[in-house]
Structures are given as C-alpha cells and as structure tokens.
Amino acid sequence: HHRAQQDREPGDRAPDRALTVGITGAPGAGKSTLNATLCAELLARGRSVAVLAIDPSSPFSGGAILGDRVRMGDVAGADGLYIRSMATRGHLGGLTGATNDAIAVLGATGRDLVIVETVGVGQVETDIVDSADTTVVVVNPGWGDAIQANKAGLMEIADIFVVNKADRDGARDTVTDLESMLNLSGGHDDGPAQWRPPVVSTVGTTGEGVAELADALEAHVAHQHATGELDRRRSAQRSQRLREVAVARVGRALDDLLATGWGGALRAEVEEAHTDPWAAASRLIERLAQQLTDD
C-alpha cells in the first residue's frame, strides 16, 4: 500500500544511527549561542555535526525543512557542519514524530552527532527526551529558574544541566540550587549504574565552560555504552514510535472518512442530536476498521 511505504523511515532501523543530543530550556536561556559555541568545540575535536533547530510554535510546513539558521553565526559555513530548521506544529506525529523523521534523514548523511535544539517561544519542551540519547537542559542564573526547571519536569529528563550566562549575578546560587535538587532526587536512572547529571557553568558568548560541556557529553555517551542504557533508551523510543506512527495513521484515516459523504451525514446526525456521539463513534470505528482491512 503506497501510504505505508511513504511513512517508512529507513533511518529508524539503522542500529548505528548518529548520536542525538537534545538541547532544551526556557526561551531566552541563550541556547542558540551556546549551541553555536558547542558546535565549534565539537568540530575542533574532529566530530561532524548536524544541527536541527525545531520550532514547535510555528506551523509545520508539510515536510519542508526550512533554510539554514542565521543565528549560528561564524560556525554556519564550517565544514562538517550541517544546519537545518523545521517547524513542527501540526505535524501528524507531533513534535516527536517530526523530529524523529528529521533525525533519521540527518543521521543518514553520516554525521557523528545530531544536535536537536528547540527554539521558538512556546513552553519548555520536554518531548525532546523521546528523540534524544542525551538531553541537555539549559537554565539562566536566577533562583526562580531552577525552581521552574523542577516544575516543568526538566529535572526528570536532564542528563546534563547547563547554567548559561554564568557571568551574571546569581549564577553560583543557581548551580548550588540545582546540585541540591539533584541530591534530593538522586538522578533519573535507577540501579547501580546510575548517572548523576553534572551541572556545567558556561558563557555561550565567550565559550567559557563549553569544553567542559563537550566533556560531559562524551562522558554521558561512554556511560550509556558501558551500561547498555543507550540500547535500552533506543528500544523504548522505537516502541513509543510504533504507537505514534499507528495513531497518526489511524487519525489520518479517520479524518479522511469524516470528510466523505458518509462521514458528513454521520456528523450531521450527531450535530442535530438524532444520534448520540457514543453510538456514532462506534459506527465510525466499525466503518474505519472495515476500510483499513479493505486497504
């Protein structure tokens, strides 16, 4: 069936897909500048990097990956670096679906590393954890920010914390806050092979602390390989992806069915209270099942 063919992602099956690093945090945390400096550091270490800047607040444009980022500044033209940005709002598979599709494509270009950065003004994205091998959470100095991180559920997903703009007042306090929160929560991987998220201080604009961040990334990758955590994480992501793809496909078929004459008539019955939504839904599902079987 041609549609099933279309939905297939060859990159997803490749066991040696590129390592994926997700960078998230509140808007205004300086993620883009930090990411640019981090890319420069990784390139200097001989890594090849693809950057995917995701804007969950912009409407998805039907698969078009938008042009190169201007915000990357000096590194944008560097060899070994590939930059794309993408809008994801309204993508059938949601943020994760759109991201995973793009990671599969970028991974196929043979890069060592894909860095996924969430941009845009939406709320803090925690979905990134469904696509990343390593999740980096960036916060700004200021006591409130660490508390916000806790509220937004970032404590659970962070593999590495970065206090960016560390030359500002309150940076040291923020580091201390995060450290004590981590002491309480004890990290997020259970078992003897536990990883404790390090807290790295950086100044994205000058590159201060960025080498430490790159070291932390490498340490986390090594830890995941040594403990088998990487395989566990990816298995869980694949299983999650199975459900997402199925839900997206069924949702699409449902919309198609509702757009037919039969679907319109059924909707009209519900709108005019001739049929209750539950009975109508049962008929809809029966018809859909029939149609999916015929396909």
Which ranges hold each PLM region?
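Actinobacteria-biased recognition of intrinsically disordered, low-complexity terminal regions
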Residues: 6, 293-295
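Signal for well-folded cores of large energy- and translation-related assemblies
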Residues: 39-43, 100, 104-107, 129, ...
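Nucleotide-state-sensitive switch-loop elements of NTP-binding domains
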Residues: 1-21, 26-29, 35-146
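Residue-level signal for inorganic ion chemistry
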Residues: 55, 117, 164, 178, ...
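Canonical P-loop GTPase G-domain recognition
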Residues: 160, 166-224
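Short beta-strand/turn micro-motifs at beta-sheet edges
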Residues: 70-71, 146-151, 187-191
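Long, well-ordered amphipathic alpha-helical subdomains in the mid-to-C-terminal portions
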Residues: 201, 212-292
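Conserved P-loop NTPase nucleotide-binding/switch module
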Residues: 118-163, 168-177, 181
